[in-house]
Amino acid sequence: MTFSPKKIDKYIFKKFIGTFLISLLLIIILVIVFDAGEKIDKFVANEAPLRKIIFDYYLNFIPYFVNMYSPLFVFITVIVFTSRLAANSEIIAILSGGISYHRMMIPYLVAAALIAMASMALNFWVIPGSNVERLAFENEYVKNKNTAVRNVHYQIAPGQFVFVESFSTWNNTAYKFTLETVEDNKIVSKVSAESAAWDSLSGAWQLRRYFIRDYTSGLTDHVKSGLQLDTVIALTVEDFYSNALTVQTLDYGDLESLIKTQKLRGDANVMYALIEKHNRWAMPFSAIILTIIGVALSSRKKRGGIGWNLAFGIALAFSYVLFQRFSQMFVYTDVLPPGIAIWIPNVLFAIIAAILYKMAPK
């Protein structure tokens, strides 16, 4: 008996996408229930309007959460419905009907590739915009608004360096502000101030209790001081918000521009932007890798059935997530560059996928 490859393709593809969407819907409902239960006290304490909770937070939280864990949802989906096919001896029937194991993989890979492309599009253009509203809501009604950025060092232009001991996001003020101008490896001028407050109307910094030292006259330096001075430099208040959360709000073009600017300034926060950039590329590919692993693990009929496959699959899926988070520590500790560290989980699990695929019954 032979089977039409096209019918098998449609059958597997529909099973894949259908199970994926149903699983996704159930997980979304569970996550919203648990998340709301965890945050309900803060919603009430901060008087968050119901309309904002639904439309500003959860409507934007859902695509963020779904996209972040879509490779794992794909993996669990493949484990569940492929185990059912194997338990019902459907895979044996397909293989004995003249369709090779490699040919049977095509609808799996097509479905995984479509999900990966959708995830990539969301990563680059949709999620950043929705993150703006989600993070704004969290800052307003969930998190502590009085936060500070400490020990900031920026190169704002060739030969110009800014040093700030701390920056308060509550009043947009930099404390212990210093601006140094360097020529031929020598400091030619230095501006120091107790604080520098951002004026959003004029786009200038208002220095308070400032000192200006000019070292261009040889051994003696000229000092000028005062209580207040407005100055415009190549630094804006947005530069102090470029951390691990704010890079999530930038589309791919803006993210690339931020990376170039931060590299010029010697900004240590560039690692957050680089991690975000490589995560946006690496995560969609993991859906394809985990699909291959899922099929290889669950296509054999086992005594334990779906339960054993699902338990092992979930354990492997969460080990992937943990390893993905652990690989970022290599970036934070300067052990590996982001371009290598972020891709390590995919490379390792691609090797595992190749081994399991080779061992799968054909």
Language model regions located:
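Structural signature for solvent-exposed beta-strand/loop edge elements and short helix-capping sites
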Residues: 157-202, 206-210
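N-terminal amphipathic/hydrophobic interface segments
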Residues: 193, 225-227
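Short beta-strand/turn micro-motifs at beta-sheet edges
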Residues: 229-231
